[in-house]
Amino acid sequence: MSRYVFTSESVTEGHPDKICDQVSDAVLDALLAQDPSSRVACETVVNTGLCMITGEVTSKAQVDFIHLVRNVIKEIGYSGARAGGFDANSCAVLVALDQQSPDIAQGVDEADDHEGDPLDRVGAGDQGIMFGYACNETPELMPLPISLAHRLAKRLAEVRHNGSLEYLLPDGKTQVSVVYENDKPVAIDTILISTQHTAEVAGISDEQGIRERITEDLWTHVVEPATADLALKPSREATKYLVNPTGKFVVGGPQGDAGLTGRKIIVDTYGGYARHGGGAFSGKDPTKVDRSAAYAARYVAKCLVASGLAERAEVQLSYAIGVAKPVSILVESFGTGKVSNAELTELVQEHFDLRPGAIIETFGLRNLPQQRGGRFYQDTAAYGHFGRNDLKAPWEDVAAKSEELVKAEAKRIKQGATV
């Protein structure tokens, strides 16, 4: 019997790097909402008293970027008396956005391999490799460690926003370690929560007293509600439970650490449980395959698991800049597939159109902000891009395609039996 512990982490929306992801995606939303054909590559950096957005934009949209940035920061919670050196109302906001390089644009606008099909005319915005993953550990077909870490981080933000724990401040991190036996989760080994807080907590000012109070409050208000519906639950007796291990966490956010777009790519995806191609998502329009093809790879992997063709599936896609068709497609089922990896790969090639133009069209990626009231991608930028029922993301809706795969496999088996 194999037994091991696997750990994943998440961060709250107030983490410096996540502030940057949300700002970059808010810029993307604002541009796409007005002009769905906008080309966007927006990077954000934050530090004490400063937020700068930079990158390349080609768009007909007219956006007040300074106002937009301040609103995102304020919504996260950095404003007023408890802003801590990073106040939405007074921080410096610098805008340094240029136009997209014409050398890149020509490859995206006119793919090298087009043959009359309009979808062949949209080339990949860059070369690269992307991975998608799904497994049957949770109802949303995500690995349990990252799923739990996101639940805790999101709940931590909720109790701050709703005032249940008034001493909480925006910055925070969670980490969950899960025990596996024969590749199945059997217990929650460790829960770690680090949360920024005020210097005084519920009238308590000594460090030990503050830590003890926060520890008890977070178990009651965060851990228990976040895990209440799970079959596998943590317990105070069996689960190691750590809160603010350094003792206190008063200085946080951009006052404590600089932040940058794209530095939480493992948090954004599968918590390290599956491979990652290295490309970040936030601030990139759908022609950037770092984002759109990663969404497609997740969709394919989830379809394979939802259809029962595999218990675990990892899908690798690769692209060349300016070329529409993927350079390669590979499926790995880790020995859990009902058919071989080669047969799964062949099934994917037959039933999924993974050209960038087709991915954009299938998921409606350019029009999502417009359809969702001017905001969509900003909400993907915290608490993960995958397994999110609250987002109603099109790459998570696999019911119809999974049924198509079931029928295709049944037909293949029937044809094989009659040969």
Swiss-Prot record:
Main subcellular location of this protein, as a coarse class: cytoplasm
Catalytic reaction list: L-methionine + ATP + H2O = S-adenosyl-L-methionine + phosphate + diphosphate
Cofactor dependency: Mg(2+); K(+)
Domain of life the protein comes from: Bacteria
Protein localization: Cytoplasm
Keyword Transmembrane helix: no
Binding positions for L-methionine per the UniProt entry: 56, 100, 257, 288
MF annotations from Gene Ontology: ATP binding; magnesium ion binding; methionine adenosyltransferase activity
Annotated residues for binding of ATP: 15, 171-173, 248-249, 257, 263-264, 280, 284
Single biological process term from Gene Ontology: one-carbon metabolic process
Tagged with keyword Isomerase: no
Enzyme Commission number(s) of this protein: 2.5.1.6
The entry's keywords: ATP-binding, Cytoplasm, Magnesium, Metal-binding, Nucleotide-binding, One-carbon metabolism, Potassium, Transferase
Cross-referenced HAMAP family: S_AdoMet_synth1 (MF_00086)
Name of the protein described by the UniProt record: S-adenosylmethionine synthase
Organism of provenance: Parasynechococcus marenigrum (strain WH8102)
